[in-house]
């Protein structure tokens, strides 16, 4: 009862101030038999003198902010209720958008192509009819391995029209990682972009991928005019096949009251191991799109610049979803270009732009151009913008609002910076503590395990500005609290913490070190566990270590992330223990060449360690595990231990180069574009 009324548990540390205030009024009236007015005055003075002034200050400073958040939550709730009541499919929602916006209006700008809503609808109808002809049915899975283009959106949109879920494969993957992603979902078929043909064939040639159907699509020749025609200028199998099917709408799917039906799968690096397939349901997709719209005030008239890869949730859901569900025009690119970013925004008259932290740094590194301030972008939203460049980005490019948000693809932890608060990734209300149950708990930095109360066995909440592990309560009946997790149930289980605030409760473990100030603003500090983030991608250290082991044989090695001044995230670094062996310069060079070959052949560019430290020994824990905390403190400084040799992967020569004092200074001073 208490939790339902006040949004927190009886034993939680922070009782609601409003509850205490009302209780004091009741007590005074009962004991002193005073009038209600006198009781209120005395209670208020008592309340303020006992520390209530702090709550009053918080209330005054955050009331309007929290109203914005409440409005956003209410709009999301209304959309969820509407979905539950109407039982609409995702294709129903898009059809409504087409009718509302008009089939002749522009949906997508892509290089020299212009796709209208009608053309996108017709193309997706062709996809749906062809998949149905091939025997695909509701619940089947299709994989997409292609670069961003309008056909990419049309294919997975068409798949949803016949109830087929689509797995969006990271185009940077190769060999083992790519093979794992393909096998994870037990898909019936895959559509491969012509530009990625060779990468796919290296995996398909030597492995049984158990795929019934494989198509090659020509992204450049999947033109808007082919949406209605029966001809094609491409020789690729997918383009030819679509030319032979009609563009009429497929037979509508039966409407079912299942908001958790799988819509797409987004591959993401978890805390350990290979990339995992995160489940994106119709409900989850809607929550992310609606949440972004109302968090940052995106209008239907806005033209959104979305240069992010469409296999990412930021680009493929938060950006593309505004077009599919609300009729916004979007601008996409096959590859991000820092030099063309603002030129594109000017050309297409964009008013909203998306970013990840790396993008903002790349833009600041560009020469000053007139287009820097000739655009009409009023909102830039995304995640990962460092506080160190936040103000510089806003001032140079005259962007009035930064919409920073936080939330992993698979998580139920989604917060947003709605009021342009410098450096914050979002906030939770302190007026109604527990209304949106995201907390920061104390954690053992070495073991990464929660610190628990020795008496109750429950977790301990952090004080304001104290770093800790961000967790969010899981609830099966609350759309905001649902955790769909991964296709692999064991991987999902690893993201759950039990007995946090009460016995038997379930909480999502974000894997991120955060802190929260007294007003409820949250700030990202670092990643926990065996991952680090580089170039906007999560890198699994265990995956890199497996590749490293193939190169170093019986030697012991480990991988971790290190910070480089002036860059976002952490760059990869490998440490290898020679264990008493003394290598000649030629032997050392050969070892580095083998490592470089393995990294280049088996890892995407963002996962390849920039640094290698050759040392005599690695510190072990009491359980005979490598102490990454100890070795990571050394960073890539060659002076800390003169017996170690530190190497840097030179981005120009693509070989590992010995780090001396001059090279160390150059790296720290930003001489290299990393």
Listing of model-derived features with the role each one plays in the protein:
Residues 14-18, 25-44, 110-114, 128-176, ...:
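Conserved AMP-binding/adenylate-forming
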Residues 104, 215-216, 234-236, 243-267, ...:
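Conserved pre-ATP/AMP-binding loop-to-beta segment of ANL
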Residues 116-118, 254-256, 263-287:
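Conserved AMP-binding A3 loop
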Residues 121-126, 259, 278-299, 307, ...:
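Conserved structural elements of the adenylate-forming
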Residues 173, 180, 192, 353, ...:
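AMP-binding/adenylate-forming catalytic core of the ANL superfamily
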Residues 286-303, 311-351, 366:
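Conserved AMP-binding/adenylation subdomain of ANL enzymes
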Residues 325, 347-356, 364-445, 482, ...:
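Gly/Ser/Thr-rich phosphate-binding loop
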Residues 558-563, 573-575, 594-674:
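Conserved C-terminal "lid"/linker of ANL adenylate-forming enzymes
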């Amino acid at each position: 009862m208490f939790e339902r009324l006040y949004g927190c548990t009886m034993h939680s540390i922070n009782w609601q101030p409003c509850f205490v205030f009302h209780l004091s009024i009741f007590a005074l009236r009962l004991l002193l038999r005073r009038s209600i007015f006198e009781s209120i005055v005395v209670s208020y003075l008592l309340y303020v003198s006992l520390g209530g002034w702090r709550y009053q200050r918080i209330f005054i400073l955050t009331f309007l902010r929290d109203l914005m958040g409440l409005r956003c939550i209410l709009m999301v709730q209304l959309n969820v209720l509407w979905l539950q009541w109407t039982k609409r499919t995702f294709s129903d929602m898009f059809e409504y958008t087409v009718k509302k916006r008009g089939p002749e209006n522009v949906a997508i700008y892509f290089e020299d192509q212009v796709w209208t809503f009608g053309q996108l609808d017709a193309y997706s109808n062709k996809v749906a009819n062809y998949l149905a002809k091939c025997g695909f049915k509701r619940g089947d899975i299709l994989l997409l391995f292609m670069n961003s283009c309008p056909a990419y959106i049309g294919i997975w949109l068409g798949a949803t029209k016949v109830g087929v879920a689509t797995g969006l494969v990271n185009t940077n993957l190769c060999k083992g990682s790519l093979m794992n992603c393909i096998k994870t979902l037990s898909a019936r078929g895959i559509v491969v972009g012509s530009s990625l043909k060779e990468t796919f064939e290296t995996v398909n040639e030597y492995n049984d991928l158990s795929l019934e159907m494989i198509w090659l699509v020509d992204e450049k020749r999947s033109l808007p005019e082919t949406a209605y025609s029966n001809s094609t200028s491409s020789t690729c199998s997918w383009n030819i096949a679509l030319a032979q099917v009609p563009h009429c709408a497929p037979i509508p799917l039966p409407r079912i009251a299942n908001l958790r039906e799988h819509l797409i799968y987004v591959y993401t690096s978890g805390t350990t191991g290979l990339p995992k397939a995160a489940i994106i349901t119709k409900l989850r997709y809607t929550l992310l799109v609606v949440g972004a719209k109302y968090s940052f005030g995106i209008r239907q008239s806005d033209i959104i610049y979305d240069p992010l890869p469409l296999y990412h949730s930021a680009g493929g859901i938060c950006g593309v979803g505004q077009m599919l569900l609300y009729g916004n025009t979007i601008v996409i690119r096959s590859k991000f270009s820092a030099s063309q970013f603002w030129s594109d925004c000017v050309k297409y008259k964009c008013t909203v732009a998306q970013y990840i932290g790396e993008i903002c740094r790349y833009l600041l590194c560009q020469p000053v151009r007139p287009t820097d301030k000739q655009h009409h972008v009023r909102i830039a939203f995304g995640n990962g913008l460092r506080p160190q460049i936040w103000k510089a980005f806003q001032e140079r490019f005259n962007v009035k609002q930064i919409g920073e948000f936080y939330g992993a693809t698979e998580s139920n932890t989604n917060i947003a910076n709605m009021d342009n608060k410098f450096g914050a990734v979002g906030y939770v209300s302190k007026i109604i503590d527990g209304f949106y149950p995201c907390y920061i708990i104390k954690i053992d930095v070495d073991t990464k395990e929660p610190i628990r109360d020795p008496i109750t066995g429950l977790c301990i909440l952090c004080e304001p500005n104290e770093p800790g592990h961000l967790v969010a309560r899981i609830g099966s009946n609350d759309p905001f609290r649902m955790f769909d997790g991964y296709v692999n149930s064991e991987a999902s289980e690893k993201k759950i913490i039990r007995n946090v605030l009460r016995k038997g409760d379930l909480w999502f473990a974000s894997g991120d070190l955060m802190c929260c100030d007294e007003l409820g603003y949250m700030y990202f500090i670092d990643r926990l566990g065996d991952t680090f983030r580089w170039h906007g991608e999560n890198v699994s250290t265990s995956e890199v270590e497996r590749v490293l082991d193939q190169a170093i044989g019986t030697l012991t090695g480990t991988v971790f992330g290190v910070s480089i001044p002036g860059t976002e995230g952490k760059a990869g670094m490998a440490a290898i223990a020679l264990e008493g062996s003394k290598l000649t310069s030629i032997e050392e060079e050969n070892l580095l060449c083998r490592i470089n070959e393995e990294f280049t052949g088996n890892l995407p560019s963002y996962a390849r360690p920039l640094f290698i430290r050759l040392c005599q020994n690695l510190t072990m824990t009491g359980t005979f595990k490598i102490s990454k905390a100890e070795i990571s403190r050394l960073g890539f400084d060659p002076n800390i231990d003169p017996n170690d040799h530190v190497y840097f992967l030179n981005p120009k020569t693509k070989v590992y180069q010995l780090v001396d004092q001059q090279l160390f200074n150059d790296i720290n001073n930003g001489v290299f574009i990393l």
